[in-house]
Curated annotation (Swiss-Prot):
PANTHER family: D-XYLONATE DEHYDRATASE, D-XYLONATE DEHYDRATASE YAGF-RELATED. The modification N6-carboxylysine is found at K124. One of its GO terms (cellular component) is cytosol. Pfam families: ILV_EDD_C, ILVD_EDD_N. Belongs to the IlvD/Edd family. Its EC number is 4.2.1.9. The gene is ilvD. One of its GO terms (biological process) is L-valine biosynthetic process. This is Dihydroxy-acid dehydratase. It catalyses: (2R)-2,3-dihydroxy-3-methylbutanoate = 3-methyl-2-oxobutanoate + H2O; (2R,3R)-2,3-dihydroxy-3-methylpentanoate = (S)-3-methyl-2-oxopentanoate + H2O. The keyword Lyase applies.
Protein backbone atom coordinates (compact mmCIF):
# COMPACT_ATOMS: atom_id res chain seq x y z
CA UNK A 1 0.00 0.00 0.00
CA UNK A 2 1.48 3.41 -0.94
CA UNK A 3 2.55 5.71 1.85
CA UNK A 4 1.41 9.32 1.85
CA UNK A 5 4.08 11.31 0.04
CA UNK A 6 3.72 14.05 2.63
CA UNK A 7 4.92 11.67 5.38
CA UNK A 8 8.40 12.33 4.02
CA UNK A 9 8.19 15.81 5.59
CA UNK A 10 5.87 15.15 8.54
CA UNK A 11 7.05 11.86 10.11
CA UNK A 12 10.05 11.10 12.31
CA UNK A 13 12.41 13.07 14.53
CA UNK A 14 14.69 13.86 11.61
CA UNK A 15 11.87 15.91 10.09
CA UNK A 16 11.49 18.16 13.13
CA UNK A 17 12.70 21.12 11.11
CA UNK A 18 10.20 20.51 8.34
CA UNK A 19 7.37 20.11 10.86
CA UNK A 20 8.44 23.33 12.56
CA UNK A 21 8.04 25.11 9.24
CA UNK A 22 4.70 23.40 8.55
CA UNK A 23 3.53 24.64 11.97
CA UNK A 24 4.48 28.16 10.90
CA UNK A 25 2.00 27.81 8.03
CA UNK A 26 -0.80 27.03 10.49
CA UNK A 27 -0.60 23.25 10.79
CA UNK A 28 -1.01 21.60 14.20
CA UNK A 29 -0.35 18.16 15.66
CA UNK A 30 -3.72 16.91 14.46
CA UNK A 31 -2.82 17.79 10.84
CA UNK A 32 0.26 15.58 10.65
CA UNK A 33 -0.86 12.31 9.14
CA UNK A 34 -3.61 13.88 7.05
CA UNK A 35 -3.13 14.12 3.27
CA UNK A 36 -1.60 17.42 2.15
CA UNK A 37 -3.42 18.55 -0.96
CA UNK A 38 -2.07 21.27 -3.23
CA UNK A 39 -4.60 23.82 -4.45
CA UNK A 40 -2.97 24.91 -7.69
CA UNK A 41 -4.49 28.28 -8.52
CA UNK A 42 -3.78 30.61 -11.43
CA UNK A 43 -5.35 33.88 -10.29
CA UNK A 44 -4.06 36.99 -12.02
CA UNK A 45 -5.45 40.43 -12.74
CA UNK A 46 -3.92 40.33 -16.23
CA UNK A 47 -6.38 37.78 -17.63
CA UNK A 48 -10.21 38.02 -17.67
CA UNK A 49 -10.39 34.24 -17.52
CA UNK A 50 -8.48 34.32 -14.22
CA UNK A 51 -9.37 37.66 -12.66
CA UNK A 52 -12.12 36.07 -10.56
CA UNK A 53 -10.10 33.13 -9.20
CA UNK A 54 -8.52 34.81 -6.15
CA UNK A 55 -11.15 33.62 -3.66
CA UNK A 56 -11.93 30.30 -5.36
CA UNK A 57 -8.78 28.63 -4.10
CA UNK A 58 -9.89 29.45 -0.57
CA UNK A 59 -13.31 27.96 -1.33
CA UNK A 60 -11.71 24.68 -2.41
CA UNK A 61 -9.29 24.72 0.53
CA UNK A 62 -12.12 25.07 3.04
CA UNK A 63 -13.81 21.97 1.64
CA UNK A 64 -10.56 20.02 1.71
CA UNK A 65 -10.05 20.92 5.38
CA UNK A 66 -13.67 20.08 6.23
CA UNK A 67 -13.28 16.69 4.54
CA UNK A 68 -10.19 15.65 6.48
CA UNK A 69 -7.32 16.96 4.40
CA UNK A 70 -4.79 19.77 4.70
CA UNK A 71 -4.96 22.33 1.89
CA UNK A 72 -1.94 24.33 0.73
CA UNK A 73 -2.42 26.81 -2.11
CA UNK A 74 0.08 28.17 -4.59
CA UNK A 75 -0.21 30.06 -7.85
CA UNK A 76 1.10 29.60 -11.38
CA UNK A 77 1.65 32.25 -14.03
CA UNK A 78 -1.03 32.82 -16.67
CA UNK A 79 -0.54 34.52 -20.05
CA UNK A 80 -3.51 36.10 -21.84
CA UNK A 81 -3.07 35.13 -25.48
CA UNK A 82 -5.45 37.84 -26.65
CA UNK A 83 -3.46 40.61 -24.96
CA UNK A 84 -0.14 39.04 -25.98
CA UNK A 85 -1.37 38.71 -29.58
CA UNK A 86 0.08 40.63 -32.49
CA UNK A 87 3.40 41.65 -30.93
CA UNK A 88 6.49 40.13 -29.34
CA UNK A 89 4.52 39.01 -26.31
CA UNK A 90 3.07 36.10 -28.28
CA UNK A 91 6.51 34.49 -28.39
CA UNK A 92 6.06 33.74 -24.70
CA UNK A 93 2.63 32.11 -24.79
CA UNK A 94 3.38 28.51 -25.73
CA UNK A 95 6.66 28.39 -23.76
CA UNK A 96 4.64 29.42 -20.71
CA UNK A 97 2.91 26.02 -20.93
CA UNK A 98 6.19 24.26 -20.11
CA UNK A 99 6.93 26.76 -17.32
CA UNK A 100 3.52 26.11 -15.77
CA UNK A 101 3.97 22.33 -15.99
CA UNK A 102 7.44 22.58 -14.49
CA UNK A 103 6.41 24.98 -11.73
CA UNK A 104 3.61 22.63 -10.64
CA UNK A 105 6.06 19.73 -10.60
CA UNK A 106 8.58 21.79 -8.65
CA UNK A 107 6.11 22.89 -5.98
CA UNK A 108 4.37 19.55 -5.57
CA UNK A 109 7.54 17.47 -5.47
CA UNK A 110 9.55 19.93 -3.37
CA UNK A 111 6.87 19.85 -0.67
CA UNK A 112 5.76 16.22 -1.18
CA UNK A 113 2.08 17.02 -1.72
CA UNK A 114 -0.21 14.00 -1.95
CA UNK A 115 -2.77 15.28 -4.47
CA UNK A 116 -3.93 18.38 -6.34
CA UNK A 117 -6.93 20.44 -7.29
CA UNK A 118 -6.04 22.43 -10.40
CA UNK A 119 -7.90 25.73 -10.81
CA UNK A 120 -7.19 26.67 -14.41
CA UNK A 121 -9.03 28.34 -17.25
CA UNK A 122 -7.22 29.88 -20.18
CA UNK A 123 -5.19 28.77 -23.15
CA UNK A 124 -1.86 27.49 -21.80
CA UNK A 125 -2.79 27.13 -18.15
CA UNK A 126 -5.10 24.12 -18.46
CA UNK A 127 -2.65 22.28 -20.77
CA UNK A 128 0.32 23.11 -18.53
CA UNK A 129 -1.46 21.84 -15.43
CA UNK A 130 -2.68 18.79 -17.36
CA UNK A 131 0.86 17.95 -18.42
CA UNK A 132 2.06 18.30 -14.82
CA UNK A 133 -0.79 16.14 -13.50
CA UNK A 134 0.00 13.28 -15.85
CA UNK A 135 3.73 13.66 -15.23
CA UNK A 136 3.28 13.50 -11.44
CA UNK A 137 0.47 10.92 -11.53
CA UNK A 138 -1.04 11.74 -8.14
CA UNK A 139 -4.80 12.18 -7.55
CA UNK A 140 -6.10 15.34 -9.23
CA UNK A 141 -9.33 17.13 -10.09
CA UNK A 142 -9.57 20.02 -12.53
CA UNK A 143 -12.06 22.81 -11.98
CA UNK A 144 -11.77 25.77 -14.32
CA UNK A 145 -12.95 29.34 -13.98
CA UNK A 146 -15.63 28.91 -16.65
CA UNK A 147 -16.57 30.67 -19.89
CA UNK A 148 -17.29 34.37 -20.34
CA UNK A 149 -20.79 35.44 -21.30
CA UNK A 150 -21.13 36.35 -24.97
CA UNK A 151 -21.13 40.04 -25.76
CA UNK A 152 -24.18 41.63 -27.30
CA UNK A 153 -24.78 44.90 -29.11
CA UNK A 154 -27.25 46.49 -31.50
CA UNK A 155 -26.10 47.07 -35.06
CA UNK A 156 -28.44 48.09 -37.89
CA UNK A 157 -31.42 47.69 -35.54
CA UNK A 158 -30.48 44.09 -34.84
CA UNK A 159 -29.09 42.57 -31.63
CA UNK A 160 -26.02 40.48 -32.44
CA UNK A 161 -23.74 38.31 -30.33
CA UNK A 162 -20.07 39.23 -30.12
CA UNK A 163 -16.72 37.97 -28.94
CA UNK A 164 -13.08 39.04 -28.99
CA UNK A 165 -12.60 38.16 -32.66
CA UNK A 166 -15.38 40.53 -33.72
CA UNK A 167 -13.60 43.39 -32.00
CA UNK A 168 -10.38 42.54 -33.84
CA UNK A 169 -12.04 42.24 -37.25
CA UNK A 170 -14.07 45.42 -36.91
CA UNK A 171 -11.08 47.33 -35.59
CA UNK A 172 -9.04 46.49 -38.69
CA UNK A 173 -11.83 46.92 -41.26
CA UNK A 174 -11.40 50.29 -43.00
CA UNK A 175 -15.09 50.27 -43.94
CA UNK A 176 -16.19 50.27 -40.28
CA UNK A 177 -16.65 53.65 -38.60
CA UNK A 178 -14.74 54.59 -35.46
CA UNK A 179 -18.03 54.75 -33.55
CA UNK A 180 -19.09 51.24 -34.57
CA UNK A 181 -15.65 49.79 -33.91
CA UNK A 182 -15.65 51.36 -30.45
CA UNK A 183 -19.15 50.06 -29.77
CA UNK A 184 -18.15 46.51 -30.67
CA UNK A 185 -14.93 46.74 -28.64
CA UNK A 186 -16.82 47.86 -25.55
CA UNK A 187 -19.41 45.09 -25.92
CA UNK A 188 -17.33 42.09 -27.00
CA UNK A 189 -16.01 40.88 -23.62
CA UNK A 190 -18.57 41.75 -20.94
CA UNK A 191 -17.63 39.49 -18.00
CA UNK A 192 -14.90 37.48 -16.36
CA UNK A 193 -14.27 34.06 -17.82
CA UNK A 194 -12.55 32.45 -20.79
CA UNK A 195 -13.51 34.05 -24.14
CA UNK A 196 -17.04 33.07 -25.06
CA UNK A 197 -16.54 30.96 -28.19
CA UNK A 198 -15.11 27.51 -28.79
CA UNK A 199 -11.62 28.94 -28.62
CA UNK A 200 -8.61 27.18 -27.08
CA UNK A 201 -9.45 27.79 -23.42
CA UNK A 202 -13.01 26.52 -23.61
CA UNK A 203 -11.99 23.66 -25.90
CA UNK A 204 -9.42 22.46 -23.37
CA UNK A 205 -11.82 22.80 -20.44
CA UNK A 206 -14.32 20.69 -22.37
CA UNK A 207 -11.64 18.11 -23.07
CA UNK A 208 -10.79 17.70 -19.38
CA UNK A 209 -14.39 16.50 -19.00
CA UNK A 210 -13.94 13.97 -21.79
CA UNK A 211 -10.63 12.84 -20.28
CA UNK A 212 -12.50 12.24 -17.02
CA UNK A 213 -10.43 14.66 -14.94
CA UNK A 214 -13.15 17.26 -14.32
CA UNK A 215 -16.80 17.19 -13.34
CA UNK A 216 -19.84 17.40 -15.64
CA UNK A 217 -20.51 21.02 -16.58
CA UNK A 218 -16.92 22.13 -16.14
CA UNK A 219 -16.44 23.06 -19.79
CA UNK A 220 -19.62 25.04 -20.38
CA UNK A 221 -21.13 26.44 -17.15
CA UNK A 222 -20.65 30.21 -17.16
CA UNK A 223 -18.05 31.81 -14.88
CA UNK A 224 -20.63 34.28 -13.61
CA UNK A 225 -23.31 31.75 -12.71
CA UNK A 226 -23.99 30.80 -9.09
CA UNK A 227 -24.27 27.12 -10.05
CA UNK A 228 -20.58 27.01 -10.87
CA UNK A 229 -19.74 27.41 -7.19
CA UNK A 230 -20.90 23.83 -6.62
CA UNK A 231 -18.14 22.52 -8.89
CA UNK A 232 -15.53 24.09 -6.61
CA UNK A 233 -17.20 22.81 -3.45
CA UNK A 234 -17.47 19.32 -4.89
CA UNK A 235 -13.85 19.36 -6.05
CA UNK A 236 -12.61 20.09 -2.53
CA UNK A 237 -14.62 17.21 -1.08
CA UNK A 238 -13.99 14.74 -3.86
CA UNK A 239 -10.22 15.15 -3.98
CA UNK A 240 -9.95 13.99 -0.36
CA UNK A 241 -11.97 10.88 -1.23
CA UNK A 242 -9.75 10.14 -4.26
CA UNK A 243 -6.61 10.71 -2.22
CA UNK A 244 -7.67 8.33 0.55
CA UNK A 245 -8.79 5.74 -1.99
CA UNK A 246 -5.32 5.65 -3.46
CA UNK A 247 -3.13 5.96 -0.37
CA UNK A 248 -5.28 4.07 2.14
CA UNK A 249 -7.01 1.52 -0.09
CA UNK A 250 -4.31 1.07 -2.76
CA UNK A 251 -6.89 1.90 -5.44
CA UNK A 252 -4.86 2.96 -8.46
CA UNK A 253 -8.02 3.77 -10.42
CA UNK A 254 -7.92 7.11 -8.59
CA UNK A 255 -4.73 8.12 -10.41
CA UNK A 256 -4.92 10.43 -13.44
CA UNK A 257 -3.05 8.08 -15.78
CA UNK A 258 -5.67 5.40 -15.12
CA UNK A 259 -8.53 7.86 -15.66
CA UNK A 260 -7.01 9.65 -18.67
CA UNK A 261 -6.15 6.40 -20.46
CA UNK A 262 -5.55 6.07 -24.19
CA UNK A 263 -9.25 5.29 -24.57
CA UNK A 264 -10.06 8.55 -22.78
CA UNK A 265 -7.64 10.47 -25.02
CA UNK A 266 -9.38 9.02 -28.06
CA UNK A 267 -12.74 10.12 -26.61
CA UNK A 268 -11.37 13.61 -25.96
CA UNK A 269 -10.10 13.95 -29.51
CA UNK A 270 -13.39 12.58 -30.84
CA UNK A 271 -15.19 15.28 -28.86
CA UNK A 272 -12.82 17.93 -30.18
CA UNK A 273 -13.44 16.93 -33.78
CA UNK A 274 -17.21 16.75 -33.24
CA UNK A 275 -17.42 20.19 -31.62
CA UNK A 276 -15.03 21.93 -34.02
CA UNK A 277 -12.62 22.80 -31.24
CA UNK A 278 -9.43 24.79 -31.48
CA UNK A 279 -6.52 23.34 -33.45
CA UNK A 280 -4.36 24.13 -30.41
CA UNK A 281 -6.01 21.24 -28.60
CA UNK A 282 -4.20 18.86 -30.95
CA UNK A 283 -0.89 20.33 -29.81
CA UNK A 284 -1.85 20.09 -26.15
CA UNK A 285 -3.33 16.58 -26.26
CA UNK A 286 -0.20 15.29 -28.00
CA UNK A 287 1.93 16.92 -25.30
CA UNK A 288 -0.23 15.59 -22.46
CA UNK A 289 -0.18 12.07 -23.92
CA UNK A 290 3.61 12.11 -23.88
CA UNK A 291 3.58 13.07 -20.19
CA UNK A 292 1.21 10.16 -19.54
CA UNK A 293 3.49 7.86 -21.57
CA UNK A 294 0.57 7.07 -23.88
CA UNK A 295 1.20 6.23 -27.54
CA UNK A 296 -1.18 8.81 -29.00
CA UNK A 297 0.02 10.50 -32.20
CA UNK A 298 -1.01 12.53 -35.23
CA UNK A 299 -1.80 9.21 -36.91
CA UNK A 300 -4.47 8.49 -34.27
CA UNK A 301 -5.93 11.96 -34.75
CA UNK A 302 -5.97 11.48 -38.52
CA UNK A 303 -7.89 8.20 -38.19
CA UNK A 304 -10.47 9.77 -35.89
CA UNK A 305 -10.88 12.83 -38.12
CA UNK A 306 -11.92 10.59 -41.01
CA UNK A 307 -14.88 9.03 -39.20
CA UNK A 308 -16.17 11.59 -36.69
CA UNK A 309 -18.88 14.03 -37.86
CA UNK A 310 -19.30 17.62 -36.77
CA UNK A 311 -22.19 17.70 -34.27
CA UNK A 312 -21.73 21.16 -32.79
CA UNK A 313 -20.93 24.52 -34.37
CA UNK A 314 -19.92 27.43 -32.16
CA UNK A 315 -18.19 30.80 -32.54
CA UNK A 316 -15.86 31.53 -34.29
CA UNK A 317 -17.37 29.14 -36.87
CA UNK A 318 -20.78 30.80 -36.43
CA UNK A 319 -22.01 33.80 -34.47
CA UNK A 320 -25.31 32.07 -33.67
CA UNK A 321 -23.94 29.97 -30.82
CA UNK A 322 -21.46 30.61 -28.00
CA UNK A 323 -20.54 28.55 -24.92
CA UNK A 324 -23.64 29.66 -23.04
CA UNK A 325 -25.68 28.06 -25.86
CA UNK A 326 -23.62 24.86 -25.75
CA UNK A 327 -24.38 24.63 -22.04
CA UNK A 328 -28.10 25.11 -22.62
CA UNK A 329 -27.93 22.25 -25.13
CA UNK A 330 -26.37 19.92 -22.55
CA UNK A 331 -22.70 20.88 -22.66
CA UNK A 332 -19.98 18.31 -23.16
CA UNK A 333 -22.23 15.45 -22.02
CA UNK A 334 -24.78 16.48 -24.63
CA UNK A 335 -22.21 16.06 -27.39
CA UNK A 336 -20.78 12.87 -25.89
CA UNK A 337 -24.30 11.45 -25.67
CA UNK A 338 -24.80 11.86 -29.41
CA UNK A 339 -21.34 10.45 -30.14
CA UNK A 340 -22.10 7.46 -27.90
CA UNK A 341 -25.37 6.78 -29.69
CA UNK A 342 -23.41 6.89 -32.94
CA UNK A 343 -21.04 4.24 -31.60
CA UNK A 344 -18.02 6.53 -31.76
CA UNK A 345 -16.82 6.45 -28.14
CA UNK A 346 -14.88 4.08 -25.92
CA UNK A 347 -17.35 3.27 -23.14
CA UNK A 348 -14.97 1.54 -20.74
CA UNK A 349 -13.64 4.73 -19.15
CA UNK A 350 -14.28 6.40 -15.80
CA UNK A 351 -14.12 9.94 -14.45
CA UNK A 352 -13.12 11.57 -11.15
CA UNK A 353 -16.62 10.90 -9.83
CA UNK A 354 -15.97 7.17 -10.24
CA UNK A 355 -18.67 6.88 -12.91
CA UNK A 356 -18.29 4.98 -16.17
CA UNK A 357 -19.19 6.80 -19.37
CA UNK A 358 -22.61 5.08 -19.64
CA UNK A 359 -23.36 5.95 -16.00
CA UNK A 360 -22.31 9.56 -16.54
CA UNK A 361 -24.47 9.90 -19.63
CA UNK A 362 -27.45 8.31 -17.90
CA UNK A 363 -27.26 10.97 -15.20
CA UNK A 364 -26.05 14.03 -17.13
CA UNK A 365 -27.18 13.74 -20.78
CA UNK A 366 -30.19 16.08 -20.91
CA UNK A 367 -31.93 13.97 -23.55
CA UNK A 368 -32.17 10.95 -21.24
CA UNK A 369 -31.71 12.05 -17.62
CA UNK A 370 -34.58 12.02 -15.16
CA UNK A 371 -32.63 14.18 -12.71
CA UNK A 372 -34.37 17.55 -12.43
CA UNK A 373 -31.36 19.08 -10.66
CA UNK A 374 -29.20 18.26 -13.67
CA UNK A 375 -31.73 19.79 -16.04
CA UNK A 376 -31.84 22.90 -13.87
CA UNK A 377 -28.05 23.17 -13.94
CA UNK A 378 -28.00 23.07 -17.74
CA UNK A 379 -30.58 25.87 -17.86
CA UNK A 380 -28.02 28.19 -16.20
CA UNK A 381 -27.73 31.17 -18.53
CA UNK A 382 -26.23 34.64 -18.93
CA UNK A 383 -27.34 37.77 -17.08
CA UNK A 384 -25.92 40.32 -19.51
CA UNK A 385 -24.40 42.40 -16.70
CA UNK A 386 -20.77 43.52 -16.87
CA UNK A 387 -18.85 41.98 -13.97
CA UNK A 388 -15.52 40.52 -12.87
CA UNK A 389 -17.14 38.50 -10.06
CA UNK A 390 -17.62 34.75 -10.04
CA UNK A 391 -21.05 33.30 -9.15
CA UNK A 392 -22.62 36.78 -9.34
CA UNK A 393 -25.92 35.85 -11.02
CA UNK A 394 -28.45 33.01 -11.16
CA UNK A 395 -30.37 33.62 -14.40
CA UNK A 396 -31.81 30.61 -16.20
CA UNK A 397 -33.05 29.83 -19.67
CA UNK A 398 -36.78 29.15 -19.79
CA UNK A 399 -36.10 25.83 -21.50
CA UNK A 400 -33.31 23.50 -22.56
CA UNK A 401 -32.15 23.20 -26.15
CA UNK A 402 -32.69 19.49 -26.74
CA UNK A 403 -33.48 19.89 -30.45
CA UNK A 404 -30.98 17.51 -32.01
CA UNK A 405 -32.26 18.20 -35.53
CA UNK A 406 -31.83 21.98 -35.66
CA UNK A 407 -30.35 23.03 -32.31
CA UNK A 408 -26.84 23.87 -31.20
CA UNK A 409 -25.89 20.20 -30.71
CA UNK A 410 -27.00 17.78 -33.44
CA UNK A 411 -27.49 14.04 -33.65
CA UNK A 412 -25.56 12.00 -36.21
CA UNK A 413 -28.56 12.05 -38.54
CA UNK A 414 -28.63 15.86 -38.55
CA UNK A 415 -24.88 16.52 -38.29
CA UNK A 416 -23.58 19.86 -39.50
CA UNK A 417 -21.13 17.87 -41.59
CA UNK A 418 -20.37 14.19 -42.00
CA UNK A 419 -16.73 15.21 -41.83
CA UNK A 420 -15.54 16.44 -38.45
CA UNK A 421 -14.43 19.91 -37.45
CA UNK A 422 -10.67 19.17 -37.60
CA UNK A 423 -8.55 17.43 -40.22
CA UNK A 424 -4.94 16.32 -40.60
CA UNK A 425 -3.40 16.98 -44.02
CA UNK A 426 -0.21 15.44 -45.38
CA UNK A 427 1.96 16.36 -48.34
CA UNK A 428 5.44 17.01 -49.67
CA UNK A 429 5.99 20.00 -47.40
CA UNK A 430 4.04 18.61 -44.44
CA UNK A 431 5.46 15.11 -44.31
CA UNK A 432 4.58 14.77 -40.63
CA UNK A 433 1.24 16.49 -41.04
CA UNK A 434 -0.52 19.79 -40.49
CA UNK A 435 -3.88 20.76 -39.03
CA UNK A 436 -6.90 22.65 -40.35
CA UNK A 437 -10.08 23.55 -38.48
CA UNK A 438 -12.53 22.46 -41.15
CA UNK A 439 -15.44 23.71 -39.05
CA UNK A 440 -14.37 27.23 -39.98
CA UNK A 441 -13.73 26.61 -43.69
CA UNK A 442 -16.35 27.61 -46.24
CA UNK A 443 -17.44 24.72 -48.47
CA UNK A 444 -16.40 26.69 -51.55
CA UNK A 445 -12.71 26.53 -50.61
CA UNK A 446 -12.33 22.98 -49.30
CA UNK A 447 -10.22 22.54 -52.44
CA UNK A 448 -7.96 25.48 -53.20
CA UNK A 449 -4.99 26.04 -55.50
CA UNK A 450 -3.02 29.25 -55.79
CA UNK A 451 0.34 31.00 -55.91
CA UNK A 452 2.40 31.32 -52.75
CA UNK A 453 3.13 34.66 -51.09
CA UNK A 454 5.94 33.84 -48.66
CA UNK A 455 6.70 35.71 -45.44
CA UNK A 456 9.25 34.92 -42.78
CA UNK A 457 7.38 36.48 -39.88
CA UNK A 458 3.83 37.19 -38.80
CA UNK A 459 4.61 40.93 -38.76
CA UNK A 460 5.73 40.88 -42.39
CA UNK A 461 2.57 39.05 -43.42
CA UNK A 462 0.28 41.44 -41.53
CA UNK A 463 1.96 44.43 -43.20
CA UNK A 464 1.43 42.84 -46.62
CA UNK A 465 -2.21 41.96 -45.96
CA UNK A 466 -3.13 45.41 -44.67
CA UNK A 467 -1.04 47.00 -47.45
CA UNK A 468 -3.07 45.30 -50.18
CA UNK A 469 -0.22 43.08 -51.38
CA UNK A 470 -2.24 39.90 -50.80
CA UNK A 471 -4.99 39.40 -53.36
CA UNK A 472 -7.78 36.97 -54.10
CA UNK A 473 -6.47 33.50 -54.87
CA UNK A 474 -3.18 33.83 -52.99
CA UNK A 475 -1.80 31.25 -50.58
CA UNK A 476 -0.11 33.16 -47.76
CA UNK A 477 2.82 31.18 -46.30
CA UNK A 478 4.21 32.30 -42.93
CA UNK A 479 7.25 30.28 -41.91
CA UNK A 480 9.94 30.26 -39.24
CA UNK A 481 7.17 30.74 -36.68
CA UNK A 482 7.25 27.19 -35.32
CA UNK A 483 8.22 26.16 -31.78
CA UNK A 484 11.94 26.40 -32.60
CA UNK A 485 11.88 28.98 -35.37
CA UNK A 486 9.76 31.66 -33.71
CA UNK A 487 10.66 30.67 -31.16
CA UNK A 488 7.43 29.95 -29.34
CA UNK A 489 5.05 29.11 -32.21
CA UNK A 490 3.04 32.33 -32.35
CA UNK A 491 -0.70 32.30 -32.95
CA UNK A 492 -1.78 33.82 -36.26
CA UNK A 493 -5.11 35.33 -35.26
CA UNK A 494 -4.22 38.78 -36.55
CA UNK A 495 -3.33 37.65 -40.10
CA UNK A 496 -6.51 35.58 -40.41
CA UNK A 497 -8.65 38.33 -38.89
CA UNK A 498 -7.11 40.93 -41.19
CA UNK A 499 -7.75 38.74 -44.24
CA UNK A 500 -11.42 38.88 -43.24
CA UNK A 501 -11.20 42.64 -42.70
CA UNK A 502 -9.87 43.02 -46.26
CA UNK A 503 -12.69 40.87 -47.68
CA UNK A 504 -10.40 37.91 -48.37
CA UNK A 505 -11.65 35.47 -45.75
CA UNK A 506 -13.10 33.12 -48.37
CA UNK A 507 -10.68 34.02 -51.15
CA UNK A 508 -7.25 33.15 -49.73
CA UNK A 509 -5.51 30.41 -47.80
CA UNK A 510 -2.96 30.81 -45.01
CA UNK A 511 -0.36 28.16 -44.22
CA UNK A 512 2.15 28.28 -41.37
CA UNK A 513 4.45 26.25 -39.19
CA UNK A 514 3.08 28.42 -36.41
CA UNK A 515 -0.35 27.92 -34.93
CA UNK A 516 -3.73 29.58 -34.82
CA UNK A 517 -5.85 31.01 -32.08
CA UNK A 518 -8.96 29.10 -31.18
CA UNK A 519 -10.70 32.20 -32.54
CA UNK A 520 -9.42 31.55 -36.06
CA UNK A 521 -11.64 30.49 -38.93
CA UNK A 522 -11.17 30.40 -42.70
CA UNK A 523 -8.78 28.26 -44.74
CA UNK A 524 -6.06 28.46 -42.09
CA UNK A 525 -3.62 25.55 -42.02
CA UNK A 526 -1.13 25.40 -39.16
CA UNK A 527 1.33 23.14 -37.34
CA UNK A 528 3.17 22.31 -40.59
CA UNK A 529 5.67 19.65 -39.55
CA UNK A 530 8.59 19.50 -39.73
CA UNK A 531 8.87 23.24 -39.23
CA UNK A 532 11.17 25.45 -41.31
CA UNK A 533 13.77 25.79 -38.56
CA UNK A 534 14.02 21.99 -38.32
CA UNK A 535 14.74 21.55 -42.02
CA UNK A 536 11.13 21.34 -43.14
CA UNK A 537 10.32 21.73 -46.84
CA UNK A 538 8.13 24.74 -46.01
CA UNK A 539 11.46 26.63 -45.82
CA UNK A 540 12.02 25.95 -49.53
CA UNK A 541 8.79 27.48 -50.86
CA UNK A 542 9.29 30.59 -53.02
CA UNK A 543 6.94 33.36 -54.12
CA UNK A 544 4.82 32.21 -57.05
CA UNK A 545 5.11 28.48 -56.36
CA UNK A 546 1.77 26.74 -56.78
CA UNK A 547 0.27 25.12 -53.69
CA UNK A 548 -2.70 22.75 -53.93
CA UNK A 549 -4.92 22.11 -50.91
CA UNK A 550 -7.46 19.27 -50.94
CA UNK A 551 -9.16 18.91 -47.56
CA UNK A 552 -11.60 16.13 -48.58
CA UNK A 553 -8.63 14.00 -49.65
CA UNK A 554 -6.44 15.20 -46.75
CA UNK A 555 -3.73 16.44 -49.09
CA UNK A 556 -1.49 19.52 -49.30
CA UNK A 557 1.13 19.73 -52.05
CA UNK A 558 3.84 22.06 -53.29
CA UNK A 559 3.62 21.54 -57.04
CA UNK A 560 7.32 21.17 -57.74
CA UNK A 561 9.32 18.20 -58.95
CA UNK A 562 11.33 16.19 -56.46
CA UNK A 563 14.46 17.27 -58.34
CA UNK A 564 13.67 20.97 -57.88
CA UNK A 565 12.91 20.50 -54.18
CA UNK A 566 16.21 18.61 -53.78
CA UNK A 567 18.12 21.40 -55.54
CA UNK A 568 16.58 24.02 -53.27
CA UNK A 569 17.42 21.92 -50.22
CA UNK A 570 21.04 21.69 -51.36
CA UNK A 571 21.15 25.47 -51.78
CA UNK A 572 19.69 25.95 -48.31
CA UNK A 573 22.27 23.63 -46.76
CA UNK A 574 25.01 25.61 -48.52
CA UNK A 575 24.17 28.57 -46.28
CA UNK A 576 26.08 26.80 -43.52
CA UNK A 577 25.32 28.17 -40.05
CA UNK A 578 22.58 30.33 -41.58
CA UNK A 579 20.75 27.34 -43.08
CA UNK A 580 17.14 26.93 -41.96
CA UNK A 581 16.97 30.45 -40.54
CA UNK A 582 15.11 33.53 -41.85
CA UNK A 583 17.18 35.60 -44.29
CA UNK A 584 15.97 39.08 -43.45
CA UNK A 585 14.04 38.95 -40.19
CA UNK A 586 15.12 41.22 -37.36
CA UNK A 587 13.80 39.87 -34.07
CA UNK A 588 15.13 40.22 -30.55
CA UNK A 589 15.01 36.83 -28.85
CA UNK A 590 15.69 36.64 -25.13
CA UNK A 591 17.94 34.06 -23.49
CA UNK A 592 14.87 32.41 -21.94
CA UNK A 593 13.27 31.94 -25.36
CA UNK A 594 16.53 30.71 -26.89
CA UNK A 595 16.71 28.11 -24.13
CA UNK A 596 13.16 27.00 -24.99
CA UNK A 597 13.98 26.85 -28.72
CA UNK A 598 17.08 24.72 -28.13
CA UNK A 599 14.91 21.84 -26.88
CA UNK A 600 11.64 22.39 -28.77
CA UNK A 601 10.22 19.73 -31.09
CA UNK A 602 7.86 20.40 -34.00
CA UNK A 603 4.10 20.55 -33.63
CA UNK A 604 3.49 16.91 -34.57
CA UNK A 605 5.20 16.00 -31.29
CA UNK A 606 3.14 18.52 -29.32
CA UNK A 607 5.99 21.07 -29.31
CA UNK A 608 7.32 19.43 -26.16
CA UNK A 609 10.99 19.32 -25.24
CA UNK A 610 13.20 16.85 -27.08
CA UNK A 611 13.99 14.37 -24.32
CA UNK A 612 16.75 12.78 -26.38
CA UNK A 613 18.78 15.97 -25.95
CA UNK A 614 18.50 15.56 -22.19
CA UNK A 615 19.36 11.88 -22.12
CA UNK A 616 15.71 10.98 -21.55
Amino acid sequence: MPKYRSATTTYGRNMAGARALWRATGMTDSDFGKPIIAVVNSFTQFVPGHVHLRDLGKLVAEQIEASGGVAKEFNTIAVDDGIAMGHGGMLYSLPSRELIADSVEYMVNAHCADAMVCISNCDKITPGMLMASLRLNIPVIFVSGGPMEAGKTKLSDKIIKLDLVDAMIQGADPKVSDDQSNQVERSACPTCGSCSGMFTANSMNCLTEALGLSQPGNGSLLATHADRKQLFLNAGKRIVELTKRYYEQNDESALPRNIASKAAFENAMTLDIAMGGSTNTVLHLLAAAQEAEIDFTMSDIDKLSRKVPQLCKVAPSTQKYHMEDVHRAGGVLGILGELDRAGLLNRNVKNVLGLTLPQTLEQYDITVTQDEAVKKMFRAGPAGIRTTQAFSQDCRWDSLDDDRAAGCIRSLEYAYSKDGGLAVLYGNFAENGCIVKTAGVDDSILKFTGPAKVYESQDEAVEAILGGKVVEGDVVVIRYEGPKGGPGMQEMLYPTSFLKSMGLGKACALITDGRFSGGTSGLSIGHVSPEAASGGTIALIEDGDTIAIDIPNRSIQLQLSEAEIAARREAQEARGDKAWTPKNRQRQVSFALRAYASLATSADKGAVRDKSKLGG
